[in-house]
Each structure stands twice: as structure tokens, then as C-alpha cells.
């Protein structure tokens, strides 16, 4: 199964186009306070030039649920990523109103051992200090139920993403600072090397292990799916 690759912290249309041209599956726009924070107008301009098949994701942290849904709907984002301490009832409310939700947890969070697809479509596991660029022990994801799609983040770079994939066997990987020339601007060489290294590691695993089946929107198993939701519904 190809490893899903999300490039986060996109702040301009040039980087959005570069990431998609190099083979990224998804790009993320940060609406929460951050060196990579963007406004709706910037995202709208970028989305006009991004191919439809690319997953576009808005990243929020402890934002009002109504605001999350309003921004996602107004811009036509495919999904949202909740990177704060959002309670389950707010997450459920948002999930009823957007296509899919990525929910972030810090590595070692005890909730990861009992997380399930009712809480999020995709679970992102980050370093204890999100955005710090620090690597954590990738073995900490081993206790997550196998039916959960895990998006691995936290200090990933072109130099270590292959080892991270071979160790943690995630559904996908997420990177921001690890492919930057400076905060908010992507480095073309690092982007290319990261995506190539992730694909290579995924291919190596596929060569020796069968692709796991994951549940689609209707609950049926979809072998090797890298789609966060049943894409056919929207076509």
C-alpha cells in the first residue's frame, strides 16, 4: 500500500503546486497561531491552482467547532485536522459536517491505546510538543489498534522518514519543518527527497508484507486504501 504523504504548513501557492507536482497526496494549511499560519484568502488563492485529486486540509487548534466547519465549507477543504484538546463531543459535531477529520495526539497519550474510527477518520501521532521538529520513539505507536489509520508526524525529515515508516508501519506521514528552507517556505530538494524516501520505504514493506485492509465509509474493507474517506461518493 502506498504511504500517504501529507505536506503541512503550506503558506503560498508556489509551495502548494510544488508539493503536488512532486507527488504529495495532501497539503495542509495551518489556521492556528504558528509561524506557518495562513488566512482564508491565501488558502483560496492556492486552492484555485491545486489539482482536485489532492487532499486539502485545514489545521486548527482549540478553535470553535462552528468556525472550523465554516472555514472548511467556505473554502471547500476536503478535511480538517484538530491539533488541540478538542473534547469528543466537539469532534463528533465537526465530523457530522465535514468530509473527514484528522485528530492529533501526542506520542504516549494513554488515549491512543483505545482510539478508534468513531473518534477520527485518521489519527495523527506527533511529538509531545507539536511543531517542535523533535523526533519521538516511533515504537510508541505500536499499541494503537490496527484498524486505525495512523499518520506519523514529529521531526520527520528526508533522512529519517524511511526508518520511521519501517519501524512504525504507519498509514501515512506528515511533515512541515523537515522540508523547509525557512519557516513557512518549502525547500524543493528536501520536498523531493522526503516524498521519494517515503515511497521507497512503503514499497519495501509492500514487497514483504500484504497491504492491510481498512474500512471504507460503509464499513466494508478496502484493501490497501490510501483515501481518508470513500472518494467515489463525491465523484
What do the predicted segments below correspond to?
Residues 1-235:
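Conserved N-terminal beta1-alpha1 strand-loop-helix module at the mouth
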